[in-house]
Amino acid sequence: HHLRNGDLVLPQVMAEIAAMGIRDLTLCASSLSKNHTCLIDYIRLGVITGIETSGMRGELAEAISRECILPKTHGGRARSIERGERRIDVAFIGASCCDNMGNMNGCLGPSAFGSMGYAKVDARFAKKVVAITDHLVPYPANPISIPQTAVDCVVQVERIGDPQLISQGATRKTRNPVELAIADYASQVIIAAGLVKNGFSYQAGSGGISLAVARYLKDYMKANGIKGSFASGGITSTMTEMLQEGCFEALLDVQTFDADAVASIRDDPRHIEMDAEMYADPQAKGNVANELDVMILSATEVDTNFNVNVLTASDGVIMGALGGHPDTAAGANLALVVA
């Protein structure tokens, strides 16, 4: 998931599993991307007979949209794993940097992708944990996102993925005048609500409109001397710019969306890695979603009663992911849909 369209870990793992003759597996992934079309063959062969994920895209989504899958939000997935409702037998975790004992991170190495927020929960609760890396370093690796105490074995491969493809597709900056107009209206609503003040907290998505809203808010905050407490969620270069320019005290990062954000989490101690439990587990002792003042939600469909679809197109074909949308919409003081 963290390498998104650049991921090469899942295809390599599934090829080995299929070659061993293993069948009837449930794939419990935090999310699936366009480059995971190889799963179609493994489903047809019976290697994979069940999928739990927040979403998927591309040919894989089209192929199985008429089948039965169980979509889960990021917070809901963490909750089900921690409460033992979903037991993970083996977690294969891609790490851009790892030592021989399994201490690992995602912010160093040639395939650096940033936060390992989703994998942290898997590492804590899976029966067996396999670290997969293309950058084996002398002991101890530093920093440590997932420690050796959670890891059963380390596998070195030629390449875990292409970090240049992390931001492809779902993350984009828009120049579309309609989308910019929507973003302008959305920022005016947030400001008029009286929530943009010193100490406020914020989450923006990775879509074009959401990122444009953040840029409009940045201009307003700088013009009025406003500094928020934190921004959270999937972190993009837009959010790291706001951190560097004094708009927020900190960033809480469960997933890093582009190269600039990877550099930020590596170099700036104010850019903090968090796991999916801390982010949005509804039954955790405390989660970040419930501390949000404002969250921006992109959608594929919205009806006149404000019911929101973020997973499928109007024809029922899966084209996105639940992500943390329902989690943060439930927790934030203001949930704003832009579409």
Q: Which ranges hold each PLM region?
A:
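Conserved alpha/beta enzyme-core scaffold
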Residues: H1-A339
